[in-house]
């Protein structure tokens, strides 16, 4: 691994003694070693049996290191802590699990102080995208609903061995301490955003038909002639809350 890139990532994380870190997919410990050396307490989740064995052996004498062998998508952060904003999450997420892993972690976002990930550059571009960008979509809206997104820097393909074929990037996600635009029903918001972006080239009036149904469309706070990529995160929250209220009124 490229020592310069490792140093840069560690500087971005800036781990401190006494902090509680969770590393996902530590692999051969390129980040794990400097994270442990920082004096922080480190839990790691590793799925690969051989790598887990190597990590367990390498860190056998370190009482601040705990290995959890298994799938991060089944890992419950509440087994580590009940304290709000107490865990810092770090990981090099493979492309095929990056989106499900982010959504899984966001289910426990109240426990998380911040998250720093290495992801494929195109995933980071989607996370950081704003309305009217080609990359703006479901992932952008839902992650930005929960977190501020900071695109830190790119990592060239040659920085890691074996070299991935694509450029990666480092991103920091910080859960909002106070969400000014709060969804009354976060499951409804999630369904709304998924439904909208499943047909992103259509107008909202067309792609949201299954959600709006017989509700009074004139009472909705957004222009239904717009397309899904034109709405901000706050627009989606307002729209979701309006649908929530209209559904509630319709059942009274």
Model-identified regions with their sequence ranges:
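Catalytic cores of RNA-modifying enzymes
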Residues: 1-195, 238-241, 248-252
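C-terminal lobe and adjacent flexible extensions of AdoMet/dcAdoMet transferase-like proteins
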Residues: 175, 193-252
């Amino acid at each position: 691994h490229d020592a310069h890139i490792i140093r840069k990532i560690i500087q971005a994380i800036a781990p401190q003694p006494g902090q509680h870190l969770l590393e996902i997919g530590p692999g051969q410990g390129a980040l794990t070693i400097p994270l442990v050396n920082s004096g922080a307490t480190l839990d790691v989740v590793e799925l690969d049996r051989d790598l887990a064995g190597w990590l367990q052996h390498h860190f056998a004498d370190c009482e601040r290191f705990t290995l959890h062998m298994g799938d991060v998508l089944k890992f419950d952060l509440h087994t580590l802590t009940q304290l709000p904003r107490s865990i810092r999450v770090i990981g090099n997420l493979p492309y095929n699990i990056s989106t499900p892993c982010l959504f899984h972690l966001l289910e426990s976002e109240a426990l998380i102080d911040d998250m720093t990930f290495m992801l494929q550059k195109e995933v980071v571009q989607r996370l950081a995208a704003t309305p009217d960008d080609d990359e703006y979509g479901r992932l952008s809206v839902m992650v930005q609903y929960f977190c501020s997104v900071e695109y830190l820097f790119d990592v060239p393909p040659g920085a890691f061995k074996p070299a991935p074929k694509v450029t990666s990037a480092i991103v920091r996600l910080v859960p909002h301490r106070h969400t000014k635009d709060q969804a009354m029903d976060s499951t409804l918001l999630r369904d709304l955003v998924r439904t909208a972006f499943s047909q992103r080239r259509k107008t909202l009036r067309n792609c949201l038909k299954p959600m709006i149904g017989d509700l009074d469309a004139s009472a909705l706070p957004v222009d239904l002639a717009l397309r899904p990529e034109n709405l901000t995160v706050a627009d989606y929250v307002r729209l979701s809350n309006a649908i929530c209220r209209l559904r509630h009124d319709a059942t009274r």
